[in-house]
Each structure stands twice: as C-alpha cells, then as structure tokens.
C-alpha cells in the first residue's frame, strides 16, 4: 500500500491541487445550472429553456438530435420545458420531432406531466394532456399526476386531469388514493370534485386507513363532515386497530371529535395495543379533548386496555392533562398490565416511572404530591433518577420516602445498596444519597479477613471491595472511600480493599482518618441520626418542628456536605 512518504513534496502539491480541481469540477457538474450536456446544440437548447428565449428555441428546432439528449439527471429538454412557467417554451419544444411524452427521468422516474404538476404549472399540464400525455402514468413512487395535483392543492389541475380521464381511485405504492390526499390537504373543493367523479369514501390504504381517518388525524372538520355525510364508516379501524376517533384525539380538534361522537363514534374502541382515544389525547396534551373524553370512557375499557391515561399523560410530559385526570379520580398508582409492561425492556409499571425516566421534574412532582408510590416497578424509580443524574428528581423521591437502600440484583447482587453503583463518579449525587440515610456500613462488610465478623447475608453476594477491584472502577476507589468515611465512625478496611487503596493518591488522607480517633462532634452526629432513625429523619413534619433549631437540623442533616443545595443556592 502506498503512503504519502513515497512522494516528493512537489508531487504531493500537484496531487492536492488536482484533487481540489476535481472536487470543484464535480460540484459544478452536479449543480442545477451546469448539468452535463453532450453537444453545444443541446447546451443552447437548455439555456434557451431556462431563460425563456422562444426565438432561439425555434431556430434550434432543425437540430432535432439536441432535443433527444439527456443531462446527468436523465432529463430531456422536454422535462425542463414542462416544469418552467413559459407556456410558449413548452409548445415550441413539443414541435420537435420524435419526442415521447412518456419519457421518464433517470432519478425519480418522473414524466413531463408529473413534473409539470409538481411545479404547479396548470397551463403546461393542460397542454401536455391535449397533446396526448397519459394521466395514468406514474413516477417511480407510483404517484399519479392526479395524486400530485391534489397534494399541491390545485383544484384547476385536478379538474383538468379528471376531464382527461384520470382515474380517481388510482393508488400509489402504499395504496394511497387521491381521496386520502384530499382529506390530508383539507381542500373541500377538490374533495367534492373527486366525489362527483367516483371517489370512494371507504377506500383503505396499505395500513387500513380510510380518508375519514386521515381527515380526523389532521383536524379537518368540514372534510370529516362531508365524508360522514357520504357514508364513511365512523368506527372504521386501521390494521393496527386505531379508530377514527383515536386519530381525531391525536389532532386535538374538539369540533371533529364532537362530530364523530355525534355520528356514533365509540370512545371505548381499543387499538391492538389496547390504547383508547383518551390515551392519545392525554399523551398529546390536548386538554379540551381529554375533558370531553373522560366522562365517555368507561373504567372497564381502561382496565381492559391495561394502561391508565395517567401513564399516557406522564409519558407525554403533559402536566395540565395529568392534573385533570387526577382531579377526576384516576388512580395515581394504577399499574400497567403485564402485556403492556413487556413492551419496555425495564418492565415499567407505574406512571411515576415514565415521568422519572423522562427526567420530567414537573410531572414527577405532581404525581408524588398526589400520593404516587415509589416502589411499584421492578427497577426502583430512585435508581433510574440516580443513574440519569437527575438531582432534583432524586430529592423529590427521597422527600417522598423512596428507599435509598433499595436493591436491584438482576445485574449485580451486591452486599451494599445498589444506588451507589450508579454515582461513583458523581460526588454531588453520592452525598445526596449519603446525607439521606444510605447505609454506608454495608460498604465495609465482607468475608476476606478471618478476623472480620461473619455475616450471613454477605455470602454469595458481591462486597464493595470486590466491586471496586474491577479495572474500570479501581481508579475511583480512593475518592469513593474518602467520601464514605465522612458518614461512619471507625471501620475496618479489609486486606483486599487496602491493597486497592494503597495505589490511589487519596491513600495518605484515608490512612490518617483510619488511624486517628474520630472527633466527638462527628460521633455525636452519627449517634443522633442512629437514635432518630431514618424514618424520622425522612419525615419533614418532624424535622421542621420546633424541637430542632435550624442550626441543629442543618448539622444533623449534613447541610455542609449537601453539594447540590449549595450549588443551587449559588445559582439563585
């Protein structure tokens, strides 16, 4: 393999200059104004089309070959003429001999007619059709000229195409019809034109969606009304089971929703995943739509769905909808059923978990204020927040009595509570946990030294010393242990942990702490906290009572080591 070292400096300069020239040339050739042409005559034809010079084009008609040459996109001069605004230019190009009106471009498979429609050149469309262009030939996406005309919202082009035999029910690759497109665009005139010419209101695309569902999804009231009056099925469901009303709930258009309900739409019709219209409205944050659907949705339907709209509102981060649902008596602790829970790798069950995993402080606060429990999921909400570095959410969860000493043993079954694993690099988070009663003593329980008291529940579990011996964590052991020592009295360091710590820069400080008696102030705080118990320490009513003066409370609660609160106060 050649390397740059094999070339002289002069050769390298020549090579670089040539590369730059090639790059510039490629960029030039790819630009719309400089598409490759075979002959000078073709270049003149293309320039005349771009500049609208009809007289030059007439002169070039004798060079018929110039009109048959394609550029680098596979475009003939006819394709360019069809998509430019001067009708006389197109008419002049059409006078050239041996031109097929159905020639396709190399990219996109566009015909002159589809290009004219996309460019919204109604006179060009009419001229091409009058010259014999087929209204049925599609581009490479199987999109017909009629479908494209509806998409750009041109009633004139749509009418012209229909008058020249365009088939209203022609489908694209996804079996999407002009009726679907009209429902999406929301053009009443076009829809009425299609209906008068054979448009079917219950035609389904490849996903089972009808024009009515499309209109409802995009909140087009008048289109929805027309389709219903023409016999569209109000409770039609797509292949995924989503109903027309569910689509309307996603748009949030209350007029559409009410219209569907007045015409017999069932608010308790579930999708394949079990979702109802109320779930969609809650997730999307459509407050007024949700307000309409709450009294119409049965508790039985929600139970069968296996998921509460509270889950949906929390997942979507919709605080107003969340408050509305809770105010109407929806259970804040409703657990998703197993079927829905299995759709998530973490097997989540509670609405609180959605809020916490999304890092949504406001929704978390609302749910906790309404009495949300913190221990309803296989993986604790607190562990999720700690792992994500969400300090404010961790504080909220701890204030709501989340268990700081919980365990999650699926990944690693440790002697010490799991939360510490997720914040070894984050002193702020570590101290947030330690200040709120994390059992630091469990980090110094192991079986390595014979002189150490045997502990039954250590057997078969991973002690802290072994966990920190992992090569990816060893460099964190010094700082972690130094922090932990602020929350214990005298502890024994096992030989395994000692060997790890001796290689860390924090070892001299750790050694001094271990070999010196702890201060009376430090020991008093530990004893007071032990006597109070974690339950009382976590109770705001007790800790905010007159029994504890502010200074004493701050001392007991390790306020001088609460790095998060200190940083927050500095910002404020």
Regions of interest found by a model, annotated:
Residues 43, 76, 111, 144, ...:
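Ankyrin-repeat start motif
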Residues 40, 72-73, 107-108, 140-141, ...:
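Ankyrin repeat start-site detector
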Residues 65, 98-99, 133, 166, ...:
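Ankyrin-repeat C-terminal turn/loop position
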Residues 68, 102-103, 136, 169, ...:
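Ankyrin-repeat junction/capping positions
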Residues 2-25, 36-37, 411-413, 422-431, ...:
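Cullin-RING E3 adaptor/co-adaptor recruitment helices
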